[in-house]
Amino acid sequence: MAPRKPSKKVGPQKRPSAEKRVITSKKKQLRNQSFKSKVRTILKKFELAVQSGDVESISAGLRSVYSIADKAVKRGIFKKGKADRVKSRASERACPAA
């Protein structure tokens, strides 16, 4: 019988379902990271609008913050409390400026 090639993996070998789970979790992680990055970008744009003091851009930014936070909850990326906290802080920042 031919000698077996040494495995590159350390530890027990994974079953096909476990390998698939690793692959899908990595895909989901990339998707979530991308979406969280989008959320942070929108929050930064909103913060710049608040600093500029332009009422129209503040209200548009606040709408986009609310929308993206709700989408994050719908997709399971944020919990409801986290989204509520993000929206609350954004509205606090918008009120003195508006």
Curated annotation (Swiss-Prot):
One of its GO terms (molecular function) is small ribosomal subunit rRNA binding. GO terms for cellular component: cytosol; small ribosomal subunit. Keywords: Ribonucleoprotein, Ribosomal protein, RNA-binding, rRNA-binding. One of its GO terms (biological process) is translation. InterPro entries: Ribosomal_bS20, Ribosomal_bS20_sf. The keyword Nucleotide-binding does not apply. The keyword Nucleotide-binding does not apply. Residues 1-12 have a biased composition (Basic residues). Disulfide bonds: none annotated. Residues 1-31 are annotated as: Disordered. Binds directly to 16S ribosomal RNA. PANTHER family: 30S RIBOSOMAL PROTEIN S20, SMALL RIBOSOMAL SUBUNIT PROTEIN BS20C. HAMAP family: Ribosomal_bS20. NCBIfam families: S20. Belongs to the bacterial ribosomal protein bS20 family. This is Small ribosomal subunit protein bS20. It comes from Chlamydia trachomatis serovar L2 (strain ATCC VR-902B / DSM 19102 / 434/Bu). The lineage of its organism: Bacteria, Pseudomonadati, Chlamydiota, Chlamydiia, Chlamydiales. The gene is rpsT.
